Amino acid sequence: MLYKGDTLYLDWLEDGIAELVFDAPGSVNKLDTATVASLGEAIGVLEQQSDLKGLLLRSNKAAFIVGADITEFLSLFLVPEEQLSQWLHFANSVFNRLEDLPVPTIAAVNGYALGGGCECVLATDYRLATPDLRIGLPETKLGIMPGFGGSVRMPRMLGADSALEIIAAGKDVGADQALKIGLVDGVVKAEKLVEGAKAVLRQAINGDLDWKAKRQPKLEPLKLSKIEATMSFTIAKGMVAQTAGKHYPAPITAVKTIEAAARFGREEALNLENKSFVPLAHTNEARALVGIFLNDQYVKGKAKKLTKDVETPKQAAVLGAGIMGGGIAYQSAWKGVPVVMKDINDKSLTLGMTEAAKLLNKQLERGKIDGLKLAGVISTIHPTLDYAGFDRVDIVVEAVVENPKVKKAVLAETEQKVRQDTVLASNTSTIPISELANALERPENFCGMHFFNPVHRMPLVEIIRGEKSSDETIAKVVAWASKMGKTPIVVNDCPGFFVNRVLFPYFAGFSQLLRDGADFRKIDKVMEKQFGWPMGPAYLLDVVGIDTAHHAQAVMAAGFPQRMQKDYRDAIDALFDANRFGQKNGLGFWRYKEDSKGKPKKEEDAAVEDLLAEVSQPKRDFSEEEIIARMMIPMVNEVVRCLEEGIIATPAEADMALVYGLGFPPFHGGAFRWLDTLGSAKYLDMAQQYQHLGPLYEVPEGLRNKARHNEPYYPPVEPARPVGDLKTA
């Protein structure tokens, strides 16, 4: 054994060939600060070996290196800029020394090689991969950019266009694509990976492969003519501006850095990467996006822990076909759980099956499946007008009309047709689960399961625990949601649960602004362009359905009369009374016509102004700051109340529910991350300016206490150890 660290070891393999093996405790390898230091020490040992002829890098895990240790990021990002820059210089010196070894090097890459893992293998001369490879640089999705030389080596290896596509989008690619663009040199079966890598090394050692020529382009300026450079970088900047926008500085910074570094050799190019990385790491956007990643891991880990003792349902059923029922049936069948889809009429069943078939055909068109797979999946969805097969189902989700009487009747009838241990769930969006449970003989086997539309795209499923829902019931429903590829978050019961409970105060803020003379178009523009929502409130209401919102608004007002009962007729009332239900009937805040792809396209409609004039004061201008404050304060206050009342368990789960269920702008990180970034005292000052607008603007006492003591909702993060302590090699 030449060297042994906590996460890697170095040993002789054969006749002058050494192997450096990543083998961290636990299930995966991460390129954390300690591993970077160990790698430096191991390379130091290699540099002393006079009989070294070649080096093979590999992993003892199912994946090569999944990336940097993101749990370290928030503390690293608090390190002063000079110290962070110093540590990056140290880390890059390690990879440079790996790249500069006087012998050929190869990485035998299996599974994931992401972020720092990808940057590590870019420093070797050759890369051989297994068919399950996923390799790429996802850093821009975390609000940063590659910091271990990825933005320098990848463009010089692949050419600017392919590298920009991966780096700016934070993409990873599979084995076939990696081979095609030159990111790996070969793909072999897993059992032949090490032997194949040794064979390549022997060819390089014997002079059959010119490893020095292979290495050289990574050390030099990027080989692009002036015209090629102008075209590549201009197109890339245009695409990034269009897709990422101003709220996500990392992608455009990465493109500009690669452009600026193109004319330099490795050392100067790495210095430019360093200078760009450090300021990005200190942005609120990076902290928010890293926070989302960590919250996502927390939520998924919690679901895994919750379901460890239950069996995932093997047969499901959906009550109520149509678009929603068809979407749920498709998602279940697509992920391998056969489903019975029941309705009371053929027309709805046809609609549900058509929806499922349409979604499968899209997968076929994209090349994700072939005709055989399509036929196989669709055959596991069984449409029925009766309860045939319900005696075999493990779980039933009801997705009928949002009417408590209808839902109770359907659930009570279904309970008589299923086994004693079958779980029932309701896909209600607002009706309290404990109320629906009153119709059942086995309320302990019942809970809420709130999907979001469109089901196949929206990652969140709210799992609602009723007063009598058992832990086993919740665990089984969480297991099914996870199997369907969704992110389940368990909440306690109340009108609207969590997501809709906090959404309707936001809509109330919108209604009050319109009442006071604001223009709905300006509100939408501000909330989209400035705050960053994917849709402004007017457009969102049109998509959700004015009739749906009108009904839900009444349910919420009955549930929370003190805050949500209004004493005036609002824009939603006016549009509803005029039979303007949004996109579903082509008339809402806008008029809708189908474009060439059959998608609804909004157009101005003068009739809306007349309708809104009846429920509004004369038009006046509002500043962007006031619009944002008046829209967000009611929502954030309600989010805080939900935490204080135990409706949602943690700030992390609340923020993920907002991001995954409502599209809360990820660069803000969610309501609690936004609050912490803004500061609770500053938020309180802002909210107090608008408390005259009513109870929705009154800040909860718990948040007032936070403001008094300047306490954040997320645990404070300590800066990483001084760089001198980090740098141990």
Swiss-Prot record:
A single GO BP: fatty acid beta-oxidation
Superkingdom to which the source organism belongs: Bacteria
Enzyme Commission number(s) from the entry: 4.2.1.17, 5.1.2.3, 5.3.3.8, 1.1.1.35
PROSITE patterns, per database record: 3HCDH (PS00067), ENOYL_COA_HYDRATASE (PS00166)
Pathway: Lipid metabolism; fatty acid beta-oxidation
Binding residues for substrate: D296, N500, Y660
InterPro entries according to UniProt: 3-OHacyl-CoA_DH_CS, 3-OHacyl-CoA_DH_NAD-bd, 3HC_DH_C, 6-PGluconate_DH-like_C_sf, ClpP/crotonase-like_dom_sf, Enoyl-CoA_hyd/isom_CS, Enoyl-CoA_hydra/iso, FA_oxidation_alpha_subunit
Active site: H450 (for 3-hydroxyacyl-coa dehydrogenase activity)
Coiled coil, from the record: none
Single Gene Ontology MF annotation: enoyl-CoA hydratase activity
UniProt xrefs under Pfam families: 3HCDH, 3HCDH_N, ECH_1
Keywords on record: Fatty acid metabolism, Isomerase, Lipid degradation, Lipid metabolism, Lyase, Multifunctional enzyme, NAD, Oxidoreductase
Ranges where the record places region Enoyl-CoA hydratase/isomerase: 1-189
Region (3-hydroxyacyl-CoA dehydrogenase): 311-729
Site feature Important for catalytic activity, where: E119, E139
Induction, as annotated: Repressed by FadR in the absence of LCFAs (fatty acids of, at least, 12 carbon atoms). When LCFAs are present in the medium, they are converted to long-chain acyl-CoAs which bind to FadR resulting in its release from the DNA and thus derepression of the transcription.
Keyword Protein biosynthesis: no
Entry keyword Nuclease: no
Assigned GO CC terms: fatty acid beta-oxidation multienzyme complex
NCBIfam families recorded: FadB (TIGR02437), PRK11730.1 (NF008727)
Function text: Involved in the aerobic and anaerobic degradation of long-chain fatty acids via beta-oxidation cycle. Catalyzes the formation of 3-oxoacyl-CoA from enoyl-CoA via L-3-hydroxyacyl-CoA. It can also use D-3-hydroxyacyl-CoA and cis-3-enoyl-CoA as substrate.
Family: In the N-terminal section; belongs to the enoyl-CoA hydratase/isomerase family.
Record's subunit section: Heterotetramer of two alpha chains (FadB) and two beta chains (FadA).
Protein name in the entry: Fatty acid oxidation complex subunit alpha
Protein species of origin: Escherichia coli (strain K12)
